[in-house]
């Protein structure tokens, strides 16, 4: 929504409404975004709930990074099995609506980064280190300067990075520059650790403030009869609605046989409008 650009720490820094659409368009093209074409029972149930709540006109089908057919907005007739990049990308298969998007697509339909951005990065010379965790980042000291000089260890000489690999164990690499992109929590955790260890003592005291995350809650609903059909059919998040107070609700599902996930939740029971447990 446009009003988001007038909120938060980025408000007023740029004409975001004019600048950002082109970048969103690039990301959508690379990720093969398309409107959900696998409408399942959970989506229909959400639409029914929206109608009963008086917000039926807010119901919509989500835009998702999945391949349905060559008629998707950013897809084309396949070349060597690749419907997006003229044969330069990996082979893909259409979505079958199994609901397994969030636990790993088994059919090559989900447009994960290893099928676009990372695929081409590696194809053009980048090295990808899978199952590897960064544990330390230490600026390399400038031997020509005194340890009391602020520029002695300010990163201008590069960094020594300690990695923990599942197969190689611990080892180090050096690099001139670093871009941290481990999402809101992962990047901050690593930076807090480096400041605490004294590796990067000049990290801003504003680290950890004004954080933005998904701010969502997963609420499970169980239907005790079978008249509604399987609720696992479709894509992981296939539709959504908005309530009058701005609350956003989406129909989310996991694949059939994923019942074990219910042990991660607690039971809630409402009586006369009050939460009992």
Question: Which positions does each model-derived feature cover?
Answer:
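Short, solvent-exposed loop/turn elements at domain surfaces
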Residues: 1-3, 104, 229
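Short, solvent-exposed loop/turn and secondary-structure capping segments
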Residues: 2-6, 71-73, 139, 189-194
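Conserved redox-cofactor binding core of oxidoreductases
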Residues: 9-133
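Short intrinsically disordered, low-complexity coil segments enriched in acidic
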Residues: 1-8, 123-124, 157
């Amino acid at each position: 929504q446009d009003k988001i650009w007038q909120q938060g720490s980025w408000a007023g820094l740029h004409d975001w409404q004019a600048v950002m659409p082109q970048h969103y368009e690039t990301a959508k093209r690379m990720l093969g975004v398309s409107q959900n074409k696998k409408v399942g029972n959970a989506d229909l149930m959400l639409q029914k709930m929206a109608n009963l709540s008086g917000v039926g006109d807010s119901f919509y089908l989500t835009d998702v990074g999945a391949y349905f057919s060559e008629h998707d907005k950013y897809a084309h007739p396949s070349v060597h099995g690749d419907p997006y990049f003229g044969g330069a990308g990996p082979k893909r298969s259409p979505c079958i609506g199994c609901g397994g998007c969030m636990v790993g697509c088994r059919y090559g339909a989900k447009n994960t980064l290893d099928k676009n951005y990372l695929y081409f990065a590696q194809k053009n010379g980048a090295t990808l280190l899978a199952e590897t965790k960064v544990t330390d980042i230490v600026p390399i000291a400038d031997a020509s300067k005194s340890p009391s000089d602020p520029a002695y260890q300010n990163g201008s000489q590069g960094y020594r990075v300690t990695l923990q690999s599942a197969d190689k164990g611990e080892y180090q690499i050096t690099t001139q520059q670093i871009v941290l992109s481990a999402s809101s929590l992962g990047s901050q955790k690593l930076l807090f650790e480096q400041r605490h260890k004294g590796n990067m003592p000049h990290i801003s005291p504003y680290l950890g403030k004004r954080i933005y995350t998904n701010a969502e809650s997963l609420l499970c609903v169980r239907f005790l009869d079978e008249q509604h059909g399987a609720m696992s059919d479709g894509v992981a998040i296939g539709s959504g609605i908005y309530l009058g107070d701005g609350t956003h609700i989406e129909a989310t599902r996991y694949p059939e046989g994923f019942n074990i996930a219910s042990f991660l939740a607690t039971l809630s029971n409402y009586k006369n409008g009050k939460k009992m447990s």
